[in-house]
Amino acid sequence: MSSRRIGYTRARAFSFPRMRAFLRWTWHALLLALIALVAVQFWFLAHIWYWADHNPESTAFMRTRLVIIREDEPNARLAHRWVPYHLISAHLKRAVVAAEDDKFMGHSGFDWEAMQKAHERNVREGEIVSGASTISQQLVKNLFLPSERVWWRKAQEAAITVMLETLLTKRRILEIYLNVVEWGDGVYGAEAAARHHFGVPAVALSPAQAARLAAMLPSPRSYPPGLDTVYLQQRTATILARMNYAQVP
């Protein structure tokens, strides 16, 4: 046997054990990653199942904002008070649905038509200028997900949205949303928002007040109490005209 043939045989004999070890290590790594992924999904699922009958004390977004606020005000606290669904003005429920997700009662967490339109507009503008998140998707972001845009976030958001829509009723989804959504710097939920902006409880909000709160939602920290802008006036008027047609649980 030639020396070249002997060298080739030894190289093959040496490479096979290394290849088997590499494949075994890769398989174990993938298996551990899969187990971790499933465990994370069960963690999300367990929280949503628990919140079917229990109220979340805070959200990931609220906790993140509190850390930021306390950088300037170490003793700062969030304005937040949970109120049950029946103690939230029906005007506010309709105004928020009209403003944020007018197909809320008819979809299963995703408004595909709105998503397509938003995608086309973003492509046309060459940047992200429009979104199409439903109330369910917004709630998922508030409850669980960080504010950073990372590659896995959209996939995880979609998975949790399916869990949310499967385990919770539309009434419960809207109840939680209205109790945790941001309505000012450090102001969360309908009760705190109604008192902060208008000095009344959430159940007593008028149609005009409800429409004004709904108009603030895209950028609530931009509107301290008493501030009035042309955009806010126009947006409020639009919501007022549409809210009577909004379907709510």
Describe the residue ranges of each PLM region.
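Juxtamembrane regions of bacterial inner-membrane/periplasmic proteins
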Residues: S2-Y8, F14, R18-P249
